[in-house]
């Protein structure tokens, strides 16, 4: 019994829907019409969708052609604006589901054909309006029997052939649009203020020149957070041995410490306290330039301002000393006269 069932299944598959044309190695041109032919049996689907599939590219490109009545056994398609190349195949599948294939043709080639005459192009353009209704109605699979659909197939053959022209034209234009590329101007983005609420992964070991700050989200910022050996870093986390200034030496800190703002000449930063899990919860960090020349200039400026401040302080000190000295160096005669009159007045009283 099992053998009989397997044999019947083999016969059914052999008699199922199959495509006769195009055959292997056929060459179709893009300047006219080509005919697709197939065989069906009474158990096959009453309608099927025709798809043009290109296996020469990856992933394969599937293009919808039309939905046909399978009992007709043939369909004439307009190949105008079809893609050219090798490895093309016609598939008959369930409408709207190109992966549910009923039958496949052998692979064939498509080449560029000569330009069509003006009369054929004008007739093709004039049939676009009349083919709109027929193409929309043929998009759904037929539910009638094969006998009733065969009587109406001859009347709708011309409208289907004309609608394929408009569909292939629109598909060609959509393909052209999809291959266009848009050029974008490259620009470097460097914000002056770097606000953050929750940033993790900011531990850095042996960081040089401070190109990365706060892990993944701090690219191109000149700061070193929680670094054990940071050279030429502008910012650092409070640690056991942090040297004030531009360079941070042997800054070994934990995530429980907070960033402290040093004087301007020390190039430091103020943020809020970090949590134990290593997330900076609140704060705003100023992003400085990574240009060492700018930092050197700032250090020179700060050094100059410190020198000028010390000079002004020494000048002020010297002026105070000179004014005190001038008070001491007043003429002694005036003091003596005042003392004499005071003694005389006391004796008189």
UniProtKB/Swiss-Prot annotation:
Q: Which residues lie on this side of the membrane: Cytoplasmic?
A: 348-349
Residues on Lumenal side: 17-326
Pfam families documented for this protein: Kre9_KNH
This protein's source sits in the domain of life called Eukaryota
Which stretches does UniProt call biased (Low complexity)? 116-176, 243-278, 289-322
Q: How does it sit in the membrane?
A: Single-pass membrane protein
Q: Which keywords does this Swiss-Prot/TrEMBL entry list?
A: Endoplasmic reticulum, Membrane, Signal, Transmembrane, Transmembrane helix
Transmembrane intervals? 327-347
Q: Where does the record place the region Disordered?
A: 115-190, 243-322
Q: Does the keyword Endoplasmic reticulum apply?
A: yes
Subcellular location, in the record's words? Endoplasmic reticulum membrane
The positions making up the signal sequence are 1-16
A GO cellular component term found in this entry reads: external side of plasma membrane
For this entry, the protein name equals Uncharacterized protein C553.10
Which species does this protein come from? Schizosaccharomyces pombe (strain 972 / ATCC 24843) (Fission yeast)
Q: What is the lineage of its organism?
A: Eukaryota, Fungi, Dikarya, Ascomycota, Taphrinomycotina
